[in-house]
Amino acid sequence: MSETYYKNPFSCSFSAGRWNPKGLGMIYAGSGPAISLLEYLCIKGNAFSGKSWYMIEFEISKPNLIGTLEKESLPEQWNKLPHGKITQDFGRIWLQEKEFPFLRVPSARLNLSFYPMEHNLLINPDFPDLKKYIEFDGQVRFDYLLNSI
C-alpha cells in the first residue's frame, strides 16, 4: 500500500479490477510478499518507483472461512490481459453472496501450475464482522529497487 493508505488496511479502491467491477470495493492480497509485489509491479509498471510502500502482514484467524476457486471452475479467459468482464461478474456475485470473507484465486501473472501454492486472496470488505477474522501483524516499509531501462 502507498504511504497514504497503509494506516487503514481495510481500505480498498472502488475502481474496476480483474475480479471486481467499478463501484464494488474489493481488497486484493497475495499468499506472500513476492507474489504481492509482482502483481503490483505488473499493474502499475515502474510509475511507482522512487516512492515508499508498505506491505501489510496479516493472519486469518479462521482458515475455514477461505473459499477456493478451483481450477476447473475458473471462468473462460479468466487470465486475459487486459481483464475481461467475465471475471468481474464472477467477483460481483461472490461479493454480493457473502458466503466467504476470503477467496483464494490464481494469479493471472503466473502459470496455472503454481496454483494453489502461489495465489491471490480476495477479501470482501463488506463481509459482516470481517475485522473479527483478520489479525494484523504489522507492516513492512520497502522501496521497489528497479533497474533503469
Predicted regions and their residues:
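Active-site and NAD+-binding cores of ADP-ribose-processing enzymes
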Residues: 1-12, 21, 49-149
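Extended catalytic/binding region for NAD+/ADP-ribose chemistry, centered on the ART fold
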Residues: 18-43, 121-126
